[in-house]
C-alpha cells in the first residue's frame, strides 16, 4: 500500500521500528527504506547534483538512523510510489505552540499557496482554491485538484473541435488519393483507395495533451476524490486519443482566439507532462521530486506584498535590479542583482535583499548571518552610492521565527561600517511575518520612510 506523509522542512524522519520517543517524526520501515533508495537513485542519476543539498542520511545517538529534510520544500515520490510532502517551516505566531499539529499544517499550506501564486512561471495565479478542502489534501494533491478544476470548467464549456488531417485505406473516395501508397497497398484490392482527407473532430493537439495529462495524473494521484474526478472528466475525452508525441503536439497548438480557454490548462499540462520544475531520475526507478526554490518564492512574495502597501507612494520599486556592475573595467564585469531596489523622488535609494534562513538571537554568532551575505550587502552599498550623495540604506529581510519575533517591534538589529569619506555602510535586518504579511509590510514601509539615518 502506498503511503503519504506531510512534514515541514528541516524535519528528521526516523524508522518507527527503531524508536520509542513519540515526539519524533517516524514512518514505516517500508517508507524509510524507500526514502533511502530515493537518495541513492538521485545521486546515481544526477552526477552534477548532491542530494545532501536537500536531504541527507544521518544517525542520532541512542536513537538510530534518520533522514533529514534540509532547505527543501515540495513533493517527493519514492521508487515504490510513496509520497512525502514537505512544507516550509513558517512561524505562525505566538500561539503556534498552542495550536494542534493539523491546524499548523493547514495554516502553513494556505500561506505557502499564497506565496507560490506570486511566481512568474507557475500557472496557478488565477485558479480558485476557496472550494478546495486544503486541510485534508497534501500539497501535490492540491495542485492536481486545481488542474482538474480547470479541466472540468473547460469540458463543461465544450471542447473545441478542429479539422484534422488523416490518412487511411478506405472503401470510398474521400479527399486526395495518395498515388504511391495506393499502388503499394492496393494492387490486390481494387475496391480500396488510400486517401488523405480532413475531418472536423475533437482529436486536436490541445485535447490530446490534456487527455495525456489526465491519464498521467491518474497514475500519480493517491486521493480518492481526485481519482473520481479524473474518471469523470475523461468521459468528455472519449473521442480523443492520448498524445503520442508531446513536443510535436505542443508545437501544433493554435495561438488564436479559438483556444483562449485552453491557455491556462496547457501551461499546467506542460508542467506535468514535461516534468517542468521537477527533478527526474533515470533508470527503472519511478522517483521524482517537485522542488520549490524557497529563496525565489520568498523574494517574489515579499516584492508583491511590498508593492501593494507602497502603491500610494511615488517610489519606484524594481525587482532583480540589473543597473550596476561590481567592476566597471573591462567592459562591466560581475553584474549586481539586488532582490529589490526602491528609488525615491529625491534620488535616494534603498536596497532590500531577501534570505530564506532562520536566524538565532545570538549576537556573538552574528545571529547566524552568512559572512558572504554581508560582503554582498557591502558591495551593494558602495556601488549604489550616488556621486556626491549618501550611501543607500541596505536591508536584509528574513522570515520571522519565535526567537527573533521580539525584533518585529521598534527594536532594530543594525551593522555599521565607518568609512573615511563619511559614506558609512548601514545594513539593517527586518523580520517578515508571513502569517500577517500585510501588517508586516506596513511596518517595513514605515521604517523605510523614516530612513533610520
How would you label these PLM feature ranges?
Residues 1-46, 286-453:
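Catalytic core segments in nucleotide and nucleic-acid processing enzymes
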Residues 2-282, 287-288:
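Residue(s) in the substrate-gating loop at a strand-loop-helix junction
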Amino acid at each position: 500500500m502506498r503511503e503519504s506523509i506531510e512534514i515541514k522542512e528541516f524535519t528528521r524522519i526516523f524508522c518507527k521500528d527503531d524508536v520509542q520517543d513519540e515526539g519524533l517524526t517516524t514512518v514505516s520501515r517500508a517508507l524509510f527504506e524507500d526514502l533511502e533508495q530515493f537518495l541513492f537513485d538521485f545521486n546515481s542519476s544526477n552526477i552534477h547534483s548532491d542530494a545532501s543539498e536537500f536531504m541527507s542520511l544521518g544517525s542520532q545517538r541512542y536513537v538510530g538512523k534518520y533522514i533529514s529534510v534540509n532547505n527543501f520544500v515540495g513533493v517527493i515520490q519514492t521508487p515504490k510510489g510513496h509520497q512525502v510532502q514537505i512544507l516550509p517551516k513558517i512561524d505562525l505566531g505566538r500561539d503556534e505552540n498552542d495550536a494542534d499539529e493539523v491546524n499548523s499544517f493547514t495554516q502553513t499550506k494556505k500561506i505557502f499557496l499564497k506565496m507560490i501564486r506570486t511566481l512568474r512561471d507557475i500557472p496557478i495565479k488565477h485558479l480558485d482554491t476557496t472550494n478546495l478542502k486544503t486541510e485534508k489534501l497534501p500539497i501535490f494533491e492540491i495542485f492536481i485538484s486545481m488542474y482538474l478544476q480547470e479541466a472540468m470548467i473547460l469540458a463543461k464549456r465544450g471542447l473545441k473541435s478542429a479539422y484534422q488531417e488523416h490518412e487511411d485505406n478506405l472503401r470510398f473516395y474521400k479527399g486526395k488519393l495518395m498515388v504511391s501508397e495506393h499502388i503499394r497497398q492496393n494492387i490486390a484490392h481494387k475496391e480500396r483507395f488510400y486517401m488523405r482527407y480532413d475531418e472536423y473532430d475533437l482529436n486536436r493537439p490541445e485535447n490530446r495533451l490534456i487527455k495525456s495529462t489526465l491519464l498521467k495524473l491518474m497514475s500519480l494521484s493517491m486521493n480518492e476524490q481526485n481519482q473520481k474526478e479524473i474518471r469523470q472528466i475523461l468521459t468528455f475525452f472519449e473521442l480523443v486519443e492520448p498524445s503520442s508525441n508531446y513536443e510535436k503536439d505542443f508545437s501544433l497548438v493554435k495561438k488564436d482566439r479559438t483556444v483562449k480557454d485552453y491557455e491556462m490548462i496547457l501551461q499546467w499540462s506542460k508542467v506535468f507532462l514535461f516534468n517542468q520544475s521537477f527533478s527526474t531520475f533515470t533508470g527503472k526507478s519511478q522517483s521524482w521530486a517537485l522542488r520549490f526554490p524557497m529563496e525565489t518564492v520568498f523574494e517574489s512574495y515579499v516584492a508583491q506584498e511590498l508593492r501593494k502597501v507602497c502603491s500610494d507612494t511615488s517610489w519606484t520599486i524594481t525587482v532583480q535590479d540589473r543597473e550596476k556592475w561590481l567592476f566597471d573595467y573591462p567592459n562591466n564585469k560581475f553584474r549586481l542583482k539586488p532582490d529589490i531596489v526602491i528609488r525615491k523622488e529625491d534620488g535616494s535609494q534603498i536596497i532590500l535583499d531577501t534570505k530564506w534562513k532562520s536566524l538565532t538571537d545570538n549576537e556573538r554568532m552574528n545571529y547566524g548571518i552568512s559572512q558572504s551575505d554581508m560582503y554582498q550587502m557591502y558591495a551593494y552599498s558602495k556601488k549604489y552610492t550616488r556621486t556626491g550623495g549618501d550611501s543607500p540604506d541596505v536591508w536584509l529581510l528574513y522570515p520571522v521565527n519565535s526567537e527573533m519575533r521580539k525584533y518585529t517591534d521598534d527594536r532594530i538589529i543594525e551593522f555599521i561600517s565607518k568609512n573615511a569619506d563619511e559614506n558609512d555602510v548601514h545594513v539593517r535586518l527586518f523580520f517578515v511575518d508571513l502569517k500577517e504579511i500585510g501588517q508586516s509590510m506596513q511596518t517595513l514601509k514605515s521604517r523605510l520612510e523614516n530612513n533610520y539615518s
